[in-house]
């Protein structure tokens, strides 16, 4: 019907302003726009491609590709309303509208904390988490290198959940075996270091409590959390 035609036209217009190189896109197979195009059987685009070809690769955490952005605004809401960071916003109006940073500076020069939540909610491949997979495979292939891996405590159950195993299944043995099969020489467990960290933090908390400073004590091993404290609440950071 006419409603179906309208939705098809909207998808076609979105694709006209979108990079259509799906084969090399990290979101290939998991892209909402790709799924909608398949659902509504949009096989051709009648309009010229006007996608903006700007890639911001300055951050150590994420990559922003303007040619894939559909201006849905989910990343803006996540960054401003949920994470309270405010690194990205809407810029300009009309056909010139885009999602950018203050003064359109590289994301590395903003208050971005590298939490990655914008990439988590992006329905297409406009914001993606940086991958070092190619570097890892290159290191494994180099016989002159000894390649080691370090596994965080939470990974032993998170991998199992990702593979649809029962909640809480410990797959550390399978994970180590798989890494050795890949060519990784040594695998280290971070659990011991985590235990030592807990002991140090407990001692620091007891000392902090004895001084009666009246200030809270926060601790985290997450780089994003630490950057958030440094950039947004610097008076609490020591």
Residue ranges and their predicted role:
Residues 1-2, 6, 15, 130-237:
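Iron-sulfur-associated redox domains of electron-transfer enzymes in respiratory
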Residues 22-23, 59-67, 123, 161-166, ...:
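Flexible, glycine/proline-enriched loop segments at strand-loop-helix junctions
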Residues 1-2, 6-114, 120, 127-128, ...:
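Fe-S ferredoxin-like electron-transfer domains
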